[in-house]
A protein has these predicted regions:
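Charge-rich, acidic-biased intrinsically disordered regions
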Residues: 33-35
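Transmembrane helix-loop junctions at the membrane interface of multipass transporters and ion channels
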Residues: 126-132
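Hydrophobic cores of alpha-helical transmembrane segments in multi-pass integral membrane proteins
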Residues: 2-30, 41-97, 102-126, 139-159, ...
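Short, flexible helix-coil linker/hinge segments at the edges of structured domains or between repeats
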Residues: 196-210
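Inter-helical turn/loop segments and adjacent helix faces that build the functional surface
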Residues: 158-166
């Protein structure tokens, strides 16, 4: 689908720009205050909707949140959309058939972009799990799971109606990636919501176990993509 390719280009530029911004802020933490002024009552400014409070280091556009946006934009918006674009393009040619369901393809596309927008909004609001590369809270984790399953169903359906007898190695890699990423995502994001009416949750793991599961997921998912 070309839509995934266009999304890859757009989010690639956004991700790189966010990375540059985070790097500049890391080099000079007071850079936002240099442009927008300082405010000792940052939290109070945030509550009153003051732009200055939003911009400086503890606000919505401070370093901590910009960095989370950068990593998530690169992984889930840029790299993932690129993977989907490549998978859709190559599967139809290697299997000599169209995707099994155009409807599922579009649900997959818009569902994934909805997830990205949700991540941006929640991160800017300070809603996150603090688990690096997996900071999104449990409702977004569920959305990712649903969309990932839709992608898998469409892929397996396309394989089932293929017009060639054999399967190229690339197709096996796609299947393996789909299964492995699903397992990594589910086990890494096992969380206990504080309440089903809110966003806050706590990891099902603690201490070293949590760190091992987190970074097994963080590094492996990137390699699979």
């Amino acid at each position: 689908m070309r839509a995934f390719l266009y999304a890859t280009i757009v989010f690639g530029l956004v991700g790189f720009l966010l990375g540059l911004t985070a790097a500049l802020m890391l080099f000079n933490p007071e850079l936002p205050e240099f442009f927008f002024g300082t405010d000792d009552a940052t939290i109070k400014s945030l509550q009153s909707g003051n732009l200055q409070g939003l911009i400086n280091t503890q606000g919505a556009f401070g370093f901590g949140r910009i960095r989370m946006l950068h990593t998530s934009a690169v992984i889930f918006a840029f790299v993932a959309n690129g993977f989907f674009a490549g998978a859709y393009y190559s599967m139809q040619r290697l299997l000599k058939t169209r995707m099994w369901s155009d409807t599922l393809s579009w649900i997959h596309f818009w569902g994934w972009q909805l997830m990205i927008v949700s991540v941006v909004i929640t991160f800017l609001m300070g809603i996150n799990t603090s688990k690096e590369y997996a900071e999104h809270e449990w409702p977004i984790d569920i959305l990712i799971t649903v969309v990932w399953v839709i992608f898998g169903v469409n892929m397996i359906g396309t394989i089932a109606v293929r017009r060639v007898r054999h399967l190229y190695v690339a197709i096996w890699f796609y299947l393996g990636t789909w299964v492995a990423v699903a397992m990594l995502h589910i086990f890494n994001n096992l969380e206990v919501p504080l309440s089903f009416g809110g966003w806050k949750s706590y990891s099902a793991y603690a201490g070293v176990k949590d760190a091992l599961v987190q970074w097994c997921t963080g590094t492996t998912r990137l390699r699979l993509f």
